[in-house]
Structures are given as structure tokens and as C-alpha cells.
Amino acid sequence: MAQLEHIEAIEKRLWSAADTLRANSNYASNEYFLPVMGLVFLRHAYSRFLGVKDAIAANLPTRAGKTRPLTKEDFSQKSAIFLQPQAQFDTLVALPDSADRAKAIIEAMESIEADYENLRGVLPKSEYQELDNAALGELLRTLNPEELKRVSGDVFGRIYEYFLTQFAGEKAHDDGEFFTPVSLVSLIANVIEPGSGTVLDPACGSGGMFVQSARVVERRHENPTEKLTFYGLEKNATTIRLAKMNLAVHGLEGDIQRAITYYDDPHELLHKADYVMANPPFNVDEIDADKVKRDPRLPFGLPGVNKKGKVSNGNYVWISYFYSYLNERGRAGFVMSSQASSAGRDEAAVRRKLVETGDVDIMIAIRSNFFYTRTVPCELWFLNRDRQEALRDKVLMIDARNVYRKVTRKIYDFSPEQEQNLLAIVWLYRGETGRYLDLVAGYCQRMLAEGAACARAKHFSPVPDFIAALATLRGAVEPFLMTLGVGAKNVSPLRELDDAIPLFKADAEAFRKAVSEQQAAWKTQKISNGELKKAVDRLATLAETSRDLVKQCDLLYKLACRLIETCENECNARDSDAWNARDVIRARKAADEARVLAVEQLKQVRYFWKQTNWLTERFPEAELRNVEGLVKLVDRTEIAANDWSLTPGRYVGIAPEE
């Protein structure tokens, strides 16, 4: 199993166990929320502590034969938290049922806060007194499975985010508004691409924008704590605690102040921020107009006032604030209600002034149901105060409402590949052709790797294992078939199965050889657009073959099931001593499990080919072009003719049916 899939499986299993425990303990989500997040934080701190402890200890100086003790500073240099013995997770897990676990956890949290001023008053403590001792013991054990002791990288950071996601879905805190979907935050961060400087989120919630910004820096093999300085504003005290824990769990620090951003600006970053990223509340109508009308963060004026003296809609207050925070080379990316891009009257006047600055860079429309708490569609706005002169009167409009992956019946997101494909459009817009070509080439290589894994993956062999499982199932039925003698030939599913298995084996072997040949050919592949397009066309045959093999897998299993049913229902197999029902059931289950794994692996081949095809069909010359229903580069004249609307769907047209 791939590392990412392995982590996802761990996340789901941990959440399921924790949620089941909550259900069995009669606690509401809002009662269970902070204690669970606090223990996820503590478990991660312990993981990082262990990860660097041995290396630190090996390099400690000695004097008179004595090694200097470990210190907080040793661990800070490694972006890890120093844990006193009482705060180490194994110590807490090992507590007997007779011990007061709540007291022990509180003491663990207090010891961390005593050493780290930025976490003082942040970690959950008294909340643990609300949970009974047995529930705490079970929760500690749940968060400490054996497999988590062997994983590497930022696994607990991911688990922390996953738990935030699930709690947001349950509206466990602040009606879920504290959390912005990771796929939207990631897209914003990767469009802006923070390099170095100040990152401000004036509505920071649980701090996701900071975490994703850090990941962008880490992918360049740079240290985000050296490159970026994080500043946040947030009105909810509990949410600030979540954000500070989120930063700490990723080895980051930030200055997050409690403030109502409409009226307060404690960081005083007017015209000073290098990057602004945010997901503010949508369509707020409670901002006191008198309090903000002279605010220097409103360079385009108030966007309308209602009869109650309130700003009629707060969307353009937020947008104006974001713009005003930027320095002369700053970039902003934020989530906004889809109403804002075409709002009329006073809001349209503000929008016109903003467009006329030449700093509106990119607009991306997102379909509904990306949020756990809002069903409405939204848009991502990108401002850039340091644009190429040739682009200053243009805006890139991307309508991504048809780009999504279904997560649950009600929730959507972007797959990693969908996010990359949208970013590829931005790269072409910026003239970064090399990144686009590298992505296409990467998809081709991934397709071939997935094809090779069909025959032999890291820990198993999906297609050969399925063939072997079928043979075992066929063998489990064979003793009974022998009792039928020549009559076995009249069992229709048997004939079909025995004909289909050799054919599948031959096709699977031919596929394996074809993949091997294409991998050999790839070693001399040129990464030019023309040569890559030829490769995509050449690999189309493999993609179709993998789909055919999927159909064959399903057919073979159906034939095997029909054979069993025919033996039992028409040939009275259950009455025969030669029919071992237990062996047949076991073999049937094993064959189905092997089929699922083989089919999942085979589908990956065509999936990655489809990604290459999606890009090369839409951008055949590896250059940005208008694509109906997806993207259009719009100039200011056209925007003015459309009431200064910044709604992508108004310009890109309707996508043709595929």
C-alpha cells in the first residue's frame, strides 16, 4: 500500500475508534472536541520528541565522563518540543486504572506550557476532568497504535488536520466555521507560492493557511520557520487555542491575536504584508459603518450602508482589508462568497476600483458543497501587486465548478491530481511551461509505475494474487465436481470459467510485457511538448487494456460465484460429503478481496493516463488558450462591458459534454 493510502487508512481508523468511544461515553461532540485534539497534539509532540532524541543525545558534550542532560533548546533547534518524563505519551498510556488519568494529563500539559511560553494557556487541561477515567484510558490507547510508532514524516500533522475536518463536519465548535477545507487552502497556497516574508490571515480559524504555506516552502527543501513569519487574527478564544496547537503540531510558531478584525488591527500590518490568505465569514450584515468608515484599510470606500447604519454586506470590507494589507509586491488569495464577484450598486463601484488597480490576477469558481458547514458555491480571489506589465489589464478566469471529487454524499473536494491540473493552468498563464511539461511527464511515469505494480507491488502482487485466489476457489469446488463425472461438463459456469481463466492469464501477461517495454522506452523519452503528446497517444493502448482487464476480473469473479450457486442450487452440492462449505466460503471471500485489490490497482493505470489526456487535450501546444467552460483570459474592456463582474462563469461559457 502506498504511504499516503496507509496514512489515510490510519486516519480513518483512529477517527472511527475515537468517535465510537465518544458515542459509547454519552459525550456530545463539543465536550469531546478539545480533549481529543489535545491528546492528538500530545501524541504528535511525543512522536517528534522520539524522532530527534537519539540524534541529539549522540551529539551531547561530555565533561569529566558525564554527558550533559537534554535541554529544551536542544529540541527547539530540531523543531520539536522537549517533553518532561510525565508528559511523554507512553507514560500516560501505561497508567493503571487506579491512577487519576485526568490529573496526569493535566500535569503533562502544564509541564509543556511551563517550558513554552507560546503555548501557555493554550493546551486543554480542565476539560479532561469532564471525562471518566476509563474513557480517558481507552482514548490514550486508541491514539497509540503500534503502527504509528513506525511512521515517518508529518503524519500526526495530517492526523490533526483530519480530526479537525471530522469535528467541523459535526459542527463540534463554532458551528464548524473554524475550518477551511484542506483542498481549498492548498490550492490558495500553491497559487500564491509564499517564498519568504510575512504571512497574514485576518480570519485565521484553526490556522490551516499557515500550515499549507509552510508545506509550499518545505517542498522547496527550505525551512518555513526561517522563511516565513505568521500573523493571525481570530475572534474566538477556543479557535485560537486550536490554531496554536495546529501550528505547534507542525513544528511552527505564529503570533495569533484575539480581535474582531472589522474594528481592530493589533498587528498594524497596513501595506506591510507579503502574503495575505483568508477564508472570512460570508455576507455579514452587522458591521457598524460609523466605526469603519474612516478606516485606512478601506481604500475604495464603504461598500454601501443600510438603514440600520450597518454595512449592507461585509464581503467588500474583507476584500478591501486584504488588499490594503499588501505591500507593493504582495500577493493575496482568499475564499469569498460567489455573490461578491457580481454584486451590484455600491459593491460594484468598489469592485470596479479594485479591477482598475490592475492587481486582480486570478478568479477561480468552486462548486457548492466544498464546505462542511455551507452548501453554497464560492470563489477564490487572487490579487497580485507585482504583476507583469503585459497582464495588468487582464484577469485569468477559471471555472472549476465541474472539477471535483465526491468525498461523501454531501461533501466534495479536489483530488491531488485535480488540484495539480488547475495549477497547471496557472503555470501556463505565467509562462511556466516547464512545470506544465514536468507534470504531464510525471503522470506518464506514474501511470507506468502503477502498471508495473499490477504484477508486483511492494508487499503483494495484485493481478497474480487474484489469479492464485481464483485457482484456490476453483480447487475448493473441484472435489465435488469430480463426483459429477462427465456431468460436470454440463455445468455452464464451469465451462465459461475454465475458458476465461487462461484468456485472462494471457492478457495479463501481455499487459505486463507491454508495460515493461514502455518503461524501457521511457528511459530515452524527451520532455518536449511534441514528444510528450506522442507518448500520451502511445500509452492510450495500455490505459484501455487496463480497463479491459478490470472487466475481466469482475467477470471471472461473477462466473466463479455462479459456479458455486449452480453447484448448490442445481446439483445439490450441500448434500455431498465432497462439498466443504467452509472451504468454499473462505476461498470465495479471499477471491473477492483479491479481486478488489487487483481492480483498484488496474484502475490506477487508466486514471493517470486520463490526467495526461485532460491536460494535453485542452492545451495541445503547452500554451494557455481559452477553453470553453473552463478558462478564459479576459481583458479589462470585456470586464467593463459585463458590469465589472469577476464571475468566471460569465466569461468562459459552458463546457461541452464529454
For the regions a language model picked out, list residue spans one by one.
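Conserved S-adenosyl-L-methionine
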Residues: 174-278, 282-294, 299-305, 316-317, ...
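Short, contiguous acidic/charged loop-to-helix segments that flank catalytic cores in large enzymes
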Residues: 26, 287-313, 338-347, 367-373, ...
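Conserved Class I SAM-dependent methyltransferase catalytic core
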Residues: 29-44, 188, 240, 244, ...
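Short, exposed interaction patches on small structured surface elements
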Residues: 398-433, 642-658
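Short, surface-exposed amphipathic charged segments that create phosphate/polyanion-binding patches used
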Residues: 270-272, 376-383, 411-417
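Helical mechanochemical/support elements of P-loop NTPase systems and associated helical scaffolds
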Residues: 6, 10, 28-31, 135, ...
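Non-catalytic, mostly N-terminal accessory regions of nucleic-acid modification and defense proteins
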Residues: 1-195, 255-269, 365-368, 392-399, ...
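Short, solvent-exposed loop/turn segments at the edges of secondary structure
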Residues: 225-226, 374-378, 391-392
